[in-house]
Regions:
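NAD(P)+-binding Rossmann beta1-loop-alpha1 motif at the extreme N-terminus of oxidoreductases
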Residues: 2-60
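Phosphate-coordination loops involved in phosphoryl transfer and adenosine-cofactor binding
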Residues: 12, 91, 132
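Short, well-ordered alpha-helices that flank and scaffold nucleotide-derived cofactor binding pockets
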Residues: 30-34, 79, 83, 106-110
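Rossmann-like NAD(P)-binding element
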Residues: 57-84
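ADP-ribose/adenylate-binding Rossmann-like module
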Residues: 85-104
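Rossmann-fold dinucleotide-binding core
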Residues: 100-101, 107-172
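An accessory alpha-helical subdomain
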Residues: 164-298
Length: 298
């Protein structure tokens, strides 16, 4: 039996996690430990972990390779691994868990491996599954490894969202880059405004509290991750330009001779764009979130 045929028939695989010391790398190790039917053995490589395995032996040992490297380095790491794996890649499944998809999927496809691009739309959870979360799935090339990937995706318990890699990047730019940029811009304006956060808290509205909480959530993360999300794809940079243009329009409208005549129709057009159902549901979610910010009563 060939190596490739053997890979399709055995229920378990030898899994290599590239980026095993990172947050999702550690989550993956826990996930495979909780799903032993998927992985006979899991080994990892990470420059931050001196005890991890070097990439060269992993390239010839692994059946399944999962790249969980920092988004700014993913394509380069895939290229280095491909140079080590060479013909062995044709018998392997390569997956990546990164926030952009077109470039990593293309880099993996160039190797000859079977390819699946993944983007969990959440930070690594404390649980060993993704129940209640969305997982974008960008299929690059699957044949022999399709049964294993089906079992893998089922075990995640996530809501699967199949997308073309380029379409993922277009949507992610609006879902992630645009939102992160808006929060960063607000924080930059606040930092330059001359007041401390404690001083602003004394006059804070519930909406300000929610916006500030979102900003603090962003600041609690890895600056390199957010810098990459904002800059690595043309789609993300286009979203930033759209935000700039929208802010410029608002400034011009507010500075105009008749600001209400400019602003009110625009806000009404946004109400029509969103629709009554979305507005009602979003306002209800806002009220629930505000309740969550209130200090507990005695």
């Amino acid at each position: 039996m060939s190596d490739q045929a053997e890979s399709s028939s055995r229920p378990q695989a030898r899994v290599a996690i590239i980026g095993s010391a990172g947050r999702y790398g550690r989550w993956l190790a826990g996930f495979f430990a909780a799903n032993p039917a998927l992985a006979a053995e899991v080994r990892g490589h990470d420059p931050a972990d001196p005890s991890s395995v070097a990439m060269a032996p992993l390239a010839h040992w692994a059946d399944v390779v999962v790249f969980s490297a920092p988004v700014v380095a993913t394509v380069e790491v895939i290229g280095r691994f491909a140079a080590l794996a060479r013909e062995r890649a044709e018998r392997q499944l390569w997956m990546d868990l990164t926030s952009i998809k077109a470039a990593p999927v293309a880099a993996m496809q160039a190797s000859g491996a079977e390819v699946l691009g993944l983007h969990p739309m959440c930070a690594p959870p404390a649980l060993t599954h993704l129940a209640g979360q969305r997982l974008v799935v960008c299929e690059g090339r699957l044949k022999v490894w399709r049964p294993w990937t089906t079992a893998f995706l089922t075990a995640t318990r996530a809501t699967l969202v199949p997308l073309d890699a380029r379409e993922h990047d277009r949507r992610a730019a609006q879902v992630q880059a645009l939102g992160h940029a808006a929060h960063l811009a607000q924080l930059m304006a606040l930092a330059r405004g001359g007041h401390t956060l404690d001083a602003l808290d004394a006059c804070a509205t519930p909406t300000f509290g929610l916006n500030l909480a979102m900003g603090m959530r962003l600041l609690s993360g890895d600056p390199g991750l957010y810098a990459g999300l904002l800059s690595l794809t043309e789609e993300s940079r286009a979203s930033l330009r759209a935000l700039r243009d929208a802010c410029t329009w608002l400034v011009d409208a507010a500075d105009s001779a008749a600001p209400l005549d400019a602003l009110v129709p625009h806000i009404v057009s946004l109400q029509q764009w969103a629709g009554t159902e979305r507005i009602t549901g979003g306002n209800a979610a806002y009220l629930r979130a505000v309740d969550g910010l209130r200090p507990p009563s005695d």
